[in-house]
């Protein structure tokens, strides 16, 4: 096993080669990575079977689905890499140019960050997404996956590095930390001078640990306590469609709805229909029904478990939905601002003034009017695959694509000027 220190030194030794690589060279490398990923399907599936067998009974079915791979999912990962090839290279982009009175020409240019560390949980697709995005944005990467997905991740990284071996980019620009202990995560948090940026992707426990302990700069990809508010002027059919998609299409992801707020004027009509759609109809179809966590007002219209205070602060990542009835738009916004993780929140309304108030007052990375929160995604936003959804305001916010993985520098051109 290569030590963490050796890995940090290896990636530092080769980072300049990727920081300044041409777009053509990087695109050739990405295509080779995608091809070798598909070619290694058999090996990756064998490794994934080991992880799945070890994880069964230890994590939820929803989380098992995140971990699971088949040939179609591997092909989708490769397709994601190829899509990055089609994206414009951000490195070298001129952001601003100005000329001072003394003749100095100042150019602000986009540059790579350097070496980016990614700590993530049992999500195999993050491995290929992170490798592709960091490479195209001119960065080297150090990956540390969760132990539940280690065999799968190792097989994926092996395939990606084999692809790089056929190009002029050194395979060491992608590093996988082999130690999956908690100590390895803390070592990355303290790796100032080796890592230029650290990005955690996972649950609240992981993200909070990184934010609280890292001395390396961090971009917080926050948890998603995502709200949908059904206003008194909402179209109910539209609302039901949005709720169904936001909650059931993929409940294990961070842009899935966790809390439903309903105006009291709509509760009596929409909540029974919601119960029919999310419970009765799903049972009839052989699908897992939604489990409601209801406040006292909501429980008058639909059956379910009484909500506890913490239910409105929980990212369930499962077929569980907290429901609260509110008396006004202002109460809905106040609730969101008290409980939101500032990820994605939505209003369903036909009232333009209500929509404007909601979008002005809700301070989240993505705020929706009459649309599902499931669109908060790099691919859906036209950014390609993403590094995560940033819920902070500094450097990056929302889906992080290529540009969010860069910095900039000033190039100052003169003709012998000196400062008086």
Curated annotation (Swiss-Prot):
GO terms for cellular component: cytoplasm. Its EC number is 1.2.1.41. It is an enzyme of class 1 (oxidoreductase). Keywords: Amino-acid biosynthesis, Cytoplasm, NADP, Oxidoreductase, Proline biosynthesis. Pathway: Amino-acid biosynthesis; L-proline biosynthesis; L-glutamate 5-semialdehyde from L-glutamate: step 2/2. It catalyses: L-glutamate 5-semialdehyde + phosphate + NADP(+) = L-glutamyl 5-phosphate + NADPH + H(+). The keyword NADP applies. One of its GO terms (biological process) is L-proline biosynthetic process. It is found in: Cytoplasm. InterPro entries: Ald_DH/histidinol_DH (IPR016161), Ald_DH_C (IPR016163), Ald_DH_N (IPR016162), Aldehyde_DH_dom (IPR015590), G-glutamylP_reductase_CS (IPR020593), Glu-5-SA_DH (IPR012134), GPR_dom (IPR000965). One of its GO terms (molecular function) is glutamate-5-semialdehyde dehydrogenase activity. Catalyzes the NADPH-dependent reduction of L-glutamate 5-phosphate into L-glutamate 5-semialdehyde and phosphate. The product spontaneously undergoes cyclization to form 1-pyrroline-5-carboxylate. NCBIfam families: PRK00197.1 (NF001221), proA (TIGR00407). Belongs to the gamma-glutamyl phosphate reductase family. PANTHER family: DELTA-1-PYRROLINE-5-CARBOXYLATE SYNTHASE (PTHR11063:SF8), GLUTAMATE SEMIALDEHYDE DEHYDROGENASE (PTHR11063). This is Gamma-glutamyl phosphate reductase. The lineage of its organism: Bacteria, Bacillati, Bacillota, Bacilli, Lactobacillales.
